[in-house]
Amino acid sequence: MAFYESVVITRPELTESQVESLINELTSIISTENGKVHSTESWGLRNLAYKINKNKKGHYFLINIDCNPSAIFEYERQMRINEDIIRFLTIKIDHISD
């Protein structure tokens, strides 16, 4: 298994409960693929560097993951489908720092 860091930006119109449920959906995808989510960190509602789909702000999240590449493929596929996610980036890292 490999370590990954994923930053997810959601639409600013989402309520706190909607954002939490969306993050829970994403973490459950990793769990069903026999992966492990080490941490989920909310960076809050922040300004975007430039407009994305007419949005000036977004809810930012950092998720640290330990899983197989096939799990990341499904994880990213689900994020592409979801209209509440306006941008994401997942990178492979050597180790997860605490």
Model-derived features: where do they sit?
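Structured, basic alpha/beta domains of bacterial-type, RNA-associated proteins
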Residues: 2-98
